[in-house]
């Protein structure tokens, strides 16, 4: 029996809530199949399987042709995120970077303005933690398991930080388990198969660092004699001494630095933020493809496919990169009133789709475009959170 099958999908946001009615997800009427709107080299929704589908949950394919929403709706975005994460967690029974891993990490961050994270999320993370704790140590350092453990620890740390402001024993267990999966060089193993979120050991190391950064009291309370203290230092030294493979990785490093500046991972913080302004498109958004050369995203034939895209496709602003940058800059205490950030937020406000998603074309295949999920999580965080108290003053462009 599926562990969530008897639980209704609900939230507390009024008319747009998710609720199972007569065996059909009420939100599904928003997630309709879109007809072809022109030729751009992409498959159309009618040619694609649903993006998420499990029992009563059905979310149709993400496409570039999906109509824009008449106005920005945090309710629609939250509904899409909730349904997608539930469907993946119930169906796949695992942590994925692109869906429930991103949801677990980001969802608690906007709990103040959009309500608390659902209880099922923590229950799912706890079941995953217990399952991984039963594995032999060698099984924790294989395939993408180290990355999954990093997202698990980050999700629990985020929950504690934004819901309770204290570290739970479960988060302590998850962080310690995560470090059991650490590689000798301080990184965390990951196959370079599904960029950008599953692209390298470096990317996984930044997620692990973010997990610790979201629980600052935990790391500060580590005794020097605790073996984990040496492992944490190894992680910090890896990120300090290993050149970031591309600008995308540097954005994540900046995100870690926003929460744990004491580590000194980004020496010229303001210079790097200025570089982000320089990469901003004229419409106010950013393009993920502008943050790494095609060959830098991983092995396989991906580079050839990316190079075959038109210049317009490569340079087009997308929800993933724009949402990520706007969210990270707000975590860096850049004010909403900063002209360049304001342009980015305005792009997000005007580019949501009718389903509640933000569009972003996958770097990998033109089938599921799961990158739209993290795009929506980052975009909603950027639009829903208030900036942190300033610790660095950023100049106007």
Which residues does each PLM region occupy?
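N-terminal secretory signal peptides that target proteins for export/translocation
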Residues: 1-20
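An alpha-helical repeat/solenoid feature that recognizes helix-turn-helix modules
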Residues: 46-72, 90-116, 134-176, 183-231, ...
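Active-site-surrounding "flap" and adjacent substrate/cofactor-binding loops of secreted or lumenal enzymes
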Residues: 118-133
